[in-house]
């Protein structure tokens, strides 16, 4: 019922073992439509549905990681010595870089790491990423900084299939 009328997926995983406890994809369809004389017609109807009920979004959908990415960023910036737990960045309802603006919600400013994680401050982690990309003495150039950042992301499992036995799993 939680996903009724919504598009997306929910997966609950046991952190200690990686066991999948629950997996839901929405919208779904009545599996009885795929049996009987009308299954071909029903499949065609479902495949043309713009909401894509045949797509199992839990294993085949590709989504930006959103706020789940922030602890990963924090670990990267800490490991690289770019921030400490006490490092503060301003947040004026977001982060601006040229014409790009990453919005954030209202909270105290400036903000340090723990409150930034607790409030999911977009500006804090954008500032950290900007600091990493701008550290030319440390990395030489932006490309080297980006490669180093990507190495951290790969080491933490981002960008790759989980390797489950589920059909249709995508990177």
Where are these regions (language model features)?
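Short loop/turn motifs at secondary-structure junctions and domain boundaries
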Residues: 2-6
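Beta-lactam-recognizing serine transpeptidase/beta-lactamase-like catalytic domain environment
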Residues: 8, 12-68, 72-171
């Amino acid at each position: 019922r939680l996903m009724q009328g919504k598009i997306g997926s929910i997966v609950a995983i046991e952190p200690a073992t990686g066991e999948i406890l629950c997996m839901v994809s929405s919208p779904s369809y009545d599996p009885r439509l795929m049996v009987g004389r009308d299954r071909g017609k029903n499949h065609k109807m479902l495949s043309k549905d713009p909401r894509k009920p045949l797509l199992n979004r839990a294993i085949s959908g590709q989504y930006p990681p959103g706020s789940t990415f922030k602890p990963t960023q924090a670990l990267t910036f800490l490991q690289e010595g770019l921030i400490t737990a006490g490092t503060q960045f301003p947040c004026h309802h977001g982060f601006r870089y040229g014409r790009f603006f990453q919005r954030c919600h209202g909270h105290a400013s400036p903000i340090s790491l723990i409150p930034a994680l607790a409030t999911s401050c977009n500006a804090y982690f954008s500032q950290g990423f900007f600091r990493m990309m701008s550290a030319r003495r440390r990395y030489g150039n932006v490309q080297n900084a980006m490669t180093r950042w990507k190495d951290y992301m790969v080491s933490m499992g981002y960008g790759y299939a989980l390797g489950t036995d589920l059909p249709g799993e995508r990177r």
